[in-house]
Amino acid sequence: MSVSTTVKKYGIEQAIKFMYKDPEKNLPKLMDWADTFCKGRFPGQRAAIRRAIEDPTYPYYDFIRHMMNEVDHDVLTTIVVNFFINANMVGCEKQEKLREEHNCNIPWAILLDPTSACNLHCTGCWAAEYGNKLNLTFDEIDDIIRQGKDMGVYMYIYTGGEPLVRKADLIKLCEKHDDCIFLAFTNGTLIDEKFADDMLRVKNFVPAISLEGFEEATDSRRGDGVYGKATHAMNLLRDRKLFYGISSCYTRANFESITSEEYYDSLIRMGAYFIWYFHYMPVGNDASPELLPTPEQRTEVYRRIRRYRSEKPLFAMDFQNDAEFVGGCIAGGRTYLHINANGDVDPCVFIHYSDSNIREKTLLETMKSPLLMAYHDGQPFNDNMLRPCPMLENPEKLRAMVKSSGAHSTDLQSPETVDHLCAKCDRYAAEWKPTADKLWAENRAEHDAK
């Protein structure tokens, strides 16, 4: 880190500490520091944050002040420093230099599975296909993070399996890498008082608790009592003024309820600060393509989430429909990659093919592997940002990349060929295309009119 960067980073950290004393005065000053630090990068994101700080009519104006009041001050300060400064301002500068130097993708975030084990047996879970016997050791995860930080990566996201099966190790990693931010997708059932206290102590761990909707829907897929355990976990987190969110997957069967205003408002009442919506992916030999949303349903999800974002104090992200904000597919190391519990480096958490293993190569070497370079050379996979994925909306692209790179299936329990996977997406892609093209044209017209 250069002396200039260090000085600017210190200035922002001091501004964050003072923001609680007089938010109306100091929050705009904090953004002034950020604008100076960023040197023109992230203009859209900075403009949105500034509006949320300064415009009382904007829904996130009250949201930010709500967070400042309801989230523990030290926790929120740590999250702001580690996420906005380290992972974005400092990290992105280093990533850009490495991208230019090596002519390959360098990720902003690394997703990894500490274990394939899970304490639940959810119907149709693709992660369950891995079995329950695979683990990355503490030292292996620690080394991945060390290599990642050398590349400017300060954002780590745990998937699984159920990551909190390894919660003692995860807390130790938070302690050792206190300059990073850690997010875990979790069923929430293993969050107890001790773990919540540990989260409050380390300050840099954020859970995203998975729900299928309300109690009946969640328990029918995840097991009796799971919804109650998940909401109990939220109570423990809220009592300690911790920052947490929700993750939910929409399908043809549940889209109406899981994207309903009633469900969304219930999460606000539960104290969640964000929700991450995922489109159902037909991954695995036993996956059900009939659960893929219809074009009409996906269009409705697109419109609902954008409306909620403009009106309600709960930040929503739609992994499939928000590609316009990140320039298309972010997998393959362009923004993130996935390392499973066997050490295989997958381009995406939903695409289980690999030609590299972290136990055999350095992280930087995996970025130059044939499969990840095929991603690098092919992105974006479509000019229509509502058709971003090389599997779901452009299955011919994934077929070609997997075959040309010689990548193999990383599903050790029931290996799925790329032809079998993509065949489940062909019809969906063809049916979605005309709707997506029309919707994207409307989107561009609205954008140009502003």
Where are these regions (language model features)?
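Radical SAM enzyme [4Fe-4S]-AdoMet core and its adjacent flexible, acidic
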Residues: 1-51, 219-332, 340-342, 346, ...
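Flexible mid-to-C-terminal extensions adjoining Fe-S/redox cofactors in radical SAM and related proteins
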Residues: 2-3, 7-25, 29, 34-41, ...
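Conserved alpha-helical substructure of the radical SAM core
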Residues: 28-194
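Short, charged low-complexity linear segments at domain edges
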Residues: 86-107, 317, 323, 357-373
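Short cysteine clusters
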Residues: 118, 122-125, 329, 343, ...
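A short, flexible beta-alpha/helix-coil linker loop
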Residues: 128-132, 214-217, 282-285
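Radical SAM/AdoMet-radical enzyme domain recognition
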Residues: 138-158, 164-278
